[in-house]
Curated annotation (Swiss-Prot):
Inducing factors: Expression is induced in ganoderic acid (GA) producing conditions.
Names of the cofactor(s): Mg(2+)
PROSITE patterns: POLYPRENYL_SYNTHASE_1, POLYPRENYL_SYNTHASE_2
Any single GO BP term: geranyl diphosphate biosynthetic process
Substrates-to-products reaction catalysed: isopentenyl diphosphate + dimethylallyl diphosphate = (2E)-geranyl diphosphate + diphosphate; isopentenyl diphosphate + (2E)-geranyl diphosphate = (2E,6E)-farnesyl diphosphate + diphosphate
Function statement: Farnesyl pyrophosphate synthase; part of the second module of ergosterol biosynthesis pathway that includes the middle steps of the pathway. The second module involves the formation of farnesyl diphosphate, which is also an important intermediate in the biosynthesis of ubiquinone, dolichol, heme and prenylated proteins. This module also plays a key role in the biosynthesis of triterpenes such as ganoderic acids (GA), a group of highly oxygenated lanostane-type triterpenoids which are well recognized as a main group of unique bioactive compounds in the medicinal mushroom Ganoderma lucidum.
Enzyme class: transferase
Pathway: Isoprenoid biosynthesis; farnesyl diphosphate biosynthesis; farnesyl diphosphate from geranyl diphosphate and isopentenyl diphosphate: step 1/1; Isoprenoid biosynthesis; geranyl diphosphate biosynthesis; geranyl diphosphate from dimethylallyl diphosphate and isopentenyl diphosphate: step 1/1
Species of the source: Ganoderma lucidum
Protein name: Farnesyl pyrophosphate synthase
Gene this chain is encoded by: FPS
Matching InterPro entries: FPS1-like, Isoprenoid_synthase_dom_sf, Polyprenyl_synt, Polyprenyl_synt_CS
Keyword Transferase: yes
Length: 360
């Protein structure tokens, strides 16, 4: 199983150098100076590969499930290219996000803007990662009937993510703690816009367009997919927030920092919803401080308030809700109405199985 997963990743990884060469060839063809070409190559190599690649690989997985067969070389390349475009989008977000948050490390290495000699040039570097998406889409998909849908999908998703980022930045600035701005409703808004659209809806919608799934005036398959994937993305982020507090660092692979970073996390919002006035004071006095003892006091309060049990109950509710939504997709072999295009439950089950009760 692990071997199959490693092979799948390797096959996906092998597409990246081809895309990098196309992008660098474009700069060379435009007569750009060699130092600019080298800089762009370094930007690409440092920021695009190297993550978990879940978003990118899920485009390929979804195309395979929708087609119901192995992909030929051309189909695989096109699906992987779209997957890599999602990874380019993620890189664009992360490079700029790290600057806004003044983060120190990302994926076990210094954030790009902290690399010697980069500094604020990282702003333009992030723009170039975004621009690369549209160069690749035009080069490989311009003649496809769904090309405009791909463009709109990337543009819409980018704007949605930026709106989510704005709400997050003004709700929870690192240098000014004001828990009165926090609420579970606001947390939900941030999560849906900042994470769920680009991490969950985008990869599946890309797969649907490539497989020729059309929009429909009634029972639109894209609206149906979104109605399942947005709650799925919300559940994923709540899980992420909980693991930041509850998972041991050696399992999580990093040290959780949501408390000291004043993050508008599900945990603090769940605590605020349950806290007595005295407990609320503990949160007000200790949350968002760069102080180990203050962090320990917040964690102790989470334990006292039963945040672990609260999360376990949330997880079961979320799972049951998402399973129920998936079951609204007609089962294979069932009759579908005229004009309805068959979505496959398996696309969504694959996502849910990957994240249900995960430990990291």
């Amino acid at each position: 199983m692990a071997d199959a997963k490693a092979q799948k990743r390797q096959k996906f990884d092998n597409v990246f150098p081809k895309l990098r060469e196309e992008l660098l060839a474009y700069l060379n063809q435009e007569g750009m100076p060699q130092d600019a070409v080298s800089w762009f190559q370094r930007n690409l190599d440092y920021n695009v590969p190297g993550g978990k690649l879940n978003r990118g690989i899920s485009v390929v997985d979804s195309v395979e499930i929708l087609k119901g067969r192995k992909l030929n070389d051309d189909e695989y390349f096109k699906a992987a290219l779209l997957g890599w475009c999602v990874e380019f989008l993620q890189a664009f977000f992360l490079v700029s996000d790290d600057m806004m948050d003044q983060s120190v490390t990302r994926r076990g290495q210094p954030c790009w803007f902290r690399v010697e000699g980069i500094n604020l040039i990282a702003i333009n570097d992030s723009f170039m990662l975004e621009g690369a998406i549209y160069y690749l889409l035009k080069k490989h998909f311009r003649s496809e009937p769904y090309y405009v849908h791909l463009l709109e999908l990337f543009h819409d998703t980018t704007f949605q993510t930026e709106i989510g980022q704005l709400i997050d930045l003004i709700t929870a600035p690192e240098d000014h703690v004001d828990l009165s701005k926090f609420s579970l409703a606001k947390h939900q808004k941030i999560v849906i816009y900042k994470t769920a659209y680009y991490s969950f809806y985008l990869p599946v919608a890309l797969a649907m367009y490539t497989c020729g799934v059309p929009h429909a005036p009634a029972n639109d398959p894209y609206a149906l997919a979104q109605s399942i994937l947005i709650p799925l993305g919300e559940y994923f982020q709540v899980q992420d927030d909980f693991l930041d507090f509850a998972a041991p660092p050696e399992v999580l692979g990093k040290v959780g920092t949501d408390i000291v970073d004043n993050k508008c996390s599900w945990c603090v919002n769940a605590a605020l919803a349950r806290a007595s006035p005295a407990q609320r004071r503990v949160l007000d006095d200790n949350y968002g401080l760069k102080d180990k003892e203050a962090e320990a006091r917040v964690k102790a309060l989470y334990e006292e308030l039963g945040i672990r049990d609260e999360f376990a109950a949330y997880e079961e509710r979320a799972y049951a809700r998402i399973v129920g939504l998936i079951e609204t997709i007609p089962a294979e072999g069932a009759d579908v109405g005229a004009g309805d295009v068959r979505l496959k439950r398996e696309v969504f089950k694959a996502f849910l199985d990957k994240i249900y009760k995960r430990q990291k």
